[in-house]
């Protein structure tokens, strides 16, 4: 009972190397540990590539997700987007120009791979959020304007949990609506038998 977490964390990892996992080995892990969810949270290390075109990353990460689905059949995949990151432009800290294009690419490959998606950039406040997280007291992020500190990590986790829980509550409501039997309409003199709605 409870939650068991395996954390595959490598400094400087873009997420692409996990596409080389050995399928047989991963399935052996899965048969013993029976994973329910894989969370992919990458991005900060891709922002420094000097490009605003992330079509290449979108395509390659879509292949990574497909590979993970082979490694761990039936396991749900959640993609958490890159958080905000600030860079100095003309002596002023601003959201890095690459954050939104990368975020959009991550959302697209999540949709294409039928994975769940949480937009961390939006959840933490969108444009300029990292500046606020660094400069407010007590600070929630480090002076590199990239990484959360322990307070920010806790808040980020809370934001993701809240988003997932709200989605789950919405799912339960929609399930209830779908389970309700459709009321049959009795025909009477008012209803025209052959029109766009009731055509037989």
Residues covered by each model-derived region:
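Hydrophobic/aromatic beta-strand patches that form the interior of the parallel beta-sheet core
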Residues: 6, 78, 116-118
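A short helix->loop->beta-strand "cap" motif at the edges of active sites that frequently abuts
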Residues: 72-76
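Conserved SGNH/GDSL esterase-like catalytic core that processes O-acyl groups on lipids
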Residues: 1-63, 70, 147-148, 190-199
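Structural beta-sheet core signal
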Residues: 40, 79-80
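Histidine- and/or cysteine-centered catalytic micro-motif in compact active-site loops
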Residues: 43-44, 82-84
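Generic structural signal for well-ordered alpha-helices
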Residues: 61-66, 103, 107
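Catalytic His-Asp segment of secreted/periplasmic serine-dependent ester chemistry enzymes
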Residues: 84-200
């Amino acid at each position: 009972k409870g939650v068991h977490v395996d954390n595959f964390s490598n400094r400087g990892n873009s997420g692409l190397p996990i596409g080389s996992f050995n399928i047989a080995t991963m399935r052996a892990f899965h048969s013993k540990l029976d994973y329910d969810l894989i969370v992919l949270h990458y991005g900060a290390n891709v922002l420094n590539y000097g490009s605003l075109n992330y079509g290449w990353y979108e395509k390659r990460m879509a292949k990574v997700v497909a590979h993970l689905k082979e490694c761990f059949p039936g396991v749900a995949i959640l993609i958490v987007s890159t958080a905000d990151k600030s860079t100095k432009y003309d002596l002023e800290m601003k959201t890095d120009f690459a954050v939104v294009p990368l975020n959009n690419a991550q959302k697209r490959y999540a949709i294409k791979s039928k994975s769940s998606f949480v937009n961390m950039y939006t959840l933490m406040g969108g444009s300029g959020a990292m500046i606020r997280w660094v400069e407010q007291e007590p600070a929630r992020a480090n002076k590199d304007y990239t990484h959360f500190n322990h307070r920010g990590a806790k808040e980020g986790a809370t934001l993701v949990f809240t988003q997932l829980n709200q989605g789950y509550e919405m799912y339960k409501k929609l399930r209830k609506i779908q389970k309700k039997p459709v009321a049959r309409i009795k025909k009477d003199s008012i209803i025209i038998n052959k029109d766009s709605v009731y055509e037989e």
